[in-house]
From Swiss-Prot:
Family: Belongs to the peptidase S8 family.
Protein name, entry field: Subtilisin-like protease 11
Subcellular location: Secreted
Keyword Hydrolase on entry: yes
Catalytic residues, chain numbering: D159, H191, S346
GO annotation terms (biological process): proteolysis
Top-level EC class as recorded in UniProt: hydrolase
InterPro entries per record: PCSK9_ProteinaseK-like, Peptidase_S8/S53_dom, Peptidase_S8/S53_dom_sf, Peptidase_S8_subtilisin-like, Peptidase_S8_subtilisin-rel, S8pro/Inhibitor_I9, S8pro/Inhibitor_I9_sf
Domain of life the protein comes from: Eukaryota
Glycosylation sites: N138, N252, N336, N337, N388, N396
Residue ranges annotated for the Peptidase S8 domain, each copy included: 127-400
Removed propeptide positions: 20-117
PROSITE patterns: SUBTILASE (PS51892)
């Protein structure tokens, strides 16, 4: 009897050790109750994921007869990004426990809210970012750039949508997809149009000949869920593959939230598929190490600089920041044939994305090598960049 007890205890302990971990968030205010991101182990195939999802769906069907469970949706969406597999859903505690015990699951994380990183300040003010990134020395508004101007590069603006009819896009913008239920295929906020035009606009942008694809993943108030951002990333990779644009694509994420490992992995795998990913450092005036997407691997994270080549007061900083780029008082296009001025690392990121697109077009550099090349080209100009942070300011290599 004693031997049986010892063996049974050992098996139970082994099961507990093998169970997947539910990653805890240091900040609970942005967590979506009962909603989870489930990341599968590397050995899990696409077919394995489909079978696993069927199993989870059956579990949920059994659970919805229990009190308090009927309002949970169960499985929502599966993610297949460059060989990386995950899914999202809302589950009761018993179903979650079964998922954690499944040997195909790597870890589980709460779905969380994420927000834009731009602040509207005023309308119709002159811009300065274009001139700054095309000159080593400060003080000029002339924008000097390679004539290829991002030609042949596809820019994915994952944001609040894009006003694709705005004249600043010159007919180069198309609607891609909308993953936010209950919203229209438009940009009622303005943030998405502003960031896309900063990167690609004919007047306000850097890569003036790039193709533009609108991907709506944030609602009309500038907020969203990481589960939807991941869905948008999956769509972008699939769309780029269909268009033979992998290796010739840029994706911008001007958003920020608490660190979410599942989201970081999705972003990294999108980058690894052959897309240059520019991201915002965040607007909390703190170290961006614990922020997503800033902390994701293989992305080019931008902090915001001022017209005086100083760190913008709200900009995050830290070792994950690869470059500073103009981010304070940036004029760009906004919906309904308008313009506006916004401030934040949301504006810095598309500067990096736009220069990255021009570099890919003119020098035929692979997306995976773009950020390192931008760092190599950059000007050491930013004063008081923050602790453990580069002082490198984005430069497009114009020779000026």
């Amino acid at each position: 009897m004693g031997l049986f007890t010892v063996v049974f205890t050992a098996i139970a302990a082994l099961s507990a050790v093998d169970a997947a971990e539910l990653l805890r968030s240091p900040n609970s205010k942005d967590i979506v109750p009962n909603s989870y991101l489930v990341v599968m182990k590397d050995s899990v195939s696409s077919a394995d994921l489909d079978s696993h999802v069927s199993w989870v769906t059956d579990l949920h069907s059994e659970s919805i007869t229990k009190p308090g469970v009927k309002n949970l949706d169960g499985f929502k969406h599966s993610y297949k990004i460059n060989g990386w597999h995950a899914y999202s859903g809302s589950f009761d505690s018993e179903t979650l426990a079964s998922i954690l015990d499944n040997d195909q699951v790597d870890f589980v994380e709460h779905d969380r809210y994420v927000y834009i990183d731009g602040l509207v300040t005023q309308k119709d003010a002159p811009s300065w970012g274009l001139g700054r990134v095309s000159h080593r020395m400060n003080g000029t508004r002339d924008y000097v750039y390679d004539e290829t101007a991002g030609s042949g590069i596809t820019f994915y603006g994952v944001d609040t949508g894009i006003d694709i009819r705005h004249p600043d896009f010159g007919g180069r913008a198309v609607w891609g997809t909308n993953v936010v239920s209950g919203t229209g295929d438009n940009d009622r906020h303005g943030h998405g149009t502003h960031t896309a035009a900063t990167a690609t606009g004919t007047k306000y942008g850097l890569a003036k000949k790039a193709n533009v694809v609108a991907v709506k993943a944030l609602n009309d108030h500038g907020a969203g869920l990481w589960s939807n951002i991941m869905k948008a990333l999956e769509w972008c990779v699939d769309d780029a593959r269909k268009k033979n644009a992998l290796g010739k694509a840029v994706l911008n994420l001007s958003i920020s939230g608490g660190k979410v490992v599942a989201a970081n992995q999705a972003i990294t795998n999108a980058a690894n598929a052959g897309i240059f990913v520019s991201v915002a450092a965040g607007n909390d005036n703190q170290d961006a190490t614990n922020k997503s997407p800033a902390s994701a691997e293989n992305v080019c994270c931008a902090a915001a600089s001022t017209i005086r080549d100083e760190k913008a007061s709200i900009s995050n900083y830290g070792s994950v920041v690869k470059l500073y780029a103009p981010g304070q008082g940036i004029t760009s296009a906004t919906p309904n044939n308008s313009t506006g001025v916004m401030t934040g690392t949301s504006m810095a990121a598309p500067h990096v994305g736009g220069v990255g697109a021009t570099l890919m077009a003119s020098k035929h550099i692979a997306p995976s090598a773009v950020c390192a090349e931008l760092i190599k080209m950059a000007t050491g100009a930013v004063r008081n960049p923050g602790a453990n942070t580069t002082n490198k300011l984005l430069y497009n290599g114009s020779g000026q």
